């Protein structure tokens, strides 16, 4: 149950969209995969030769898997992640002063905001510097838990678990790696 993330979650989507849209899909995606595995196992295990064997009720399976497996484990993982430093808040993005000044170049613009070009058509660059950085915030720990447990690919931040707010310590990294394998190992 992996999915491709072709967007930067921290800048593209609101907290509400991340929570109600993507998190629900992360739970349903994982529950669907597990329910299909259950149906397949029931189909192989059926001893009924008259063609009337049942592989179960998909909606009952989805509900039970979500309520009795995914939600409790995700809750425990989210509490652990928050305790280890994964952010879980609804704060606005924070602008902080950096330790050292960052120097960079940017295109020089005319009065209309269009980039100026030199004789060869290349943009004219000007030196700039900054001493501030904007840090994204948000309810990350709760979404990180189901992302890892359900082996879903899309994270809160574009860098996923490589971002220090999603994976701040080696211990959280270990638990995230183990949580990816928890359900597949339990189903085998």
Which residues does each predicted region cover?
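P-loop potassium selectivity filter motif centered on the GYG triad
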Residues: 1-22, 88-177
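A conserved hydrophobic secondary-structure block that centers on an alpha-helix together
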Residues: 13-90, 170-188
């Amino acid at each position: 149950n992996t999915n491709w993330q072709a967007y930067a979650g921290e800048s593209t989507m609101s907290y509400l969209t991340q929570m109600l849209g993507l998190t629900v899909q992360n739970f349903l995606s994982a529950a669907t995969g597990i329910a299909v595995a259950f149906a397949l196992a029931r189909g192989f295990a059926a001893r009924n030769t008259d063609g009337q064997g049942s592989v179960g009720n998909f909606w009952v399976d989805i509900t039970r898997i979500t309520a009795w497996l995914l939600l409790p484990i995700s809750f425990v993982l989210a509490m652990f992640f928050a305790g280890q430093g994964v952010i879980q808040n609804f704060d606005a993005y924070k602008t902080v002063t950096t330790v050292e000044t960052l120097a960079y170049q940017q295109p020089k613009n005319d009065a209309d905001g269009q980039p100026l070009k030199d004789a060869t058509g290349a943009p004219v660059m000007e030196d700039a510097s900054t001493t501030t950085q904007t840090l994204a915030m948000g309810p990350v720990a709760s979404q990180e838990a189901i992302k890892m447990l359900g082996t879903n690919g899309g994270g809160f931040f574009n860098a996923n678990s490589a971002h220090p707010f999603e994976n701040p310590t080696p211990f959280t990294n270990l638990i995230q790696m183990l949580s990816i394998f928890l359900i597949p190992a339990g189903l085998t």
